[in-house]
Amino acid sequence: VLTYDYRGIGLSKPSKMRGFKASMRIWGTQDYKALSEYIMTNFKNHHKFCLGHSVGALILGMNEDSQIFEKFVFVGTQDAFIGHLPLSVRPMALLGFGIAVPVTSSLLGYFPAHWFGLGESLPKGSAYDWRKLILNRKSTGKLFAQIEKDHSKSLHQEALVIYAERS
C-alpha cells in the first residue's frame, strides 16, 4: 500500500500557504503522475489496484498511467455540481463556494477550509478548482477542459463506487 500527499496538503504543506502554487489540475497531472511513475518503476510485477477518495478518484482521468491499475475503488467522489446537492444544502454551498472561497482566498492567498469545517487549508488554485466543480454544471468536465488531455474516457477498469445515499 502506498499513500501520498498532494502538494500543499498534509506533510507536503508549506509553512506559509500564501501564494503557494497548486491546483487540482497540478495534483492530477504532476503529483499523481509522479506517483504512477514510481509505481511503474518499482512495482512492475505486482498487481495494482487504486483506492481514490474524493479528488483522489477524480484526478485519475488526468493521467494516462491510470491504465496500470486492474481495478478501482472510489469513495465519496462524484460530479460535484451544486444542482446535484440536496435543496437544503445548496444555499450553504452557494455561499461557501460563491463567496467564501473567492473572498478568503483573495485576501489570504489560500483558502482556510478549516474555518468552515471543511478540512485543512487549501492552496488558492485548489480552492478555485473545487469552486469550479461545485458551481459549474459541467463540473468535472469543466475542470478536465483545462488540462492538456482528458484520459478519463480511456478508463474501462471495473470500479467499486462507495457513496452516501441522499436522504
Positions of the model-derived regions?
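Conserved alpha/beta-hydrolase
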Residues: V1-S15
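Conserved catalytic-core motifs of eukaryotic protein kinase domains, centered on the activation segment
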Residues: K13-R18, L85
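Alpha/beta-hydrolase active-site loop
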Residues: K21-M40
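Short coil/turn segments at beta-strand junctions that form active-site/ligand-binding loops
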Residues: N45-H47, E70, Q157-E158
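Alpha/beta-hydrolase-fold enzymes
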Residues: L51, V55-K138
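Active-site nucleophile elbow and catalytic-triad environment of alpha/beta-hydrolase enzymes
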Residues: L133-H151
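Short beta-strand/loop motif that positions the catalytic acidic residue
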Residues: L155, V161-Y163
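Acidic catalytic loop of the alpha/beta-hydrolase fold
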Residues: E165-S167
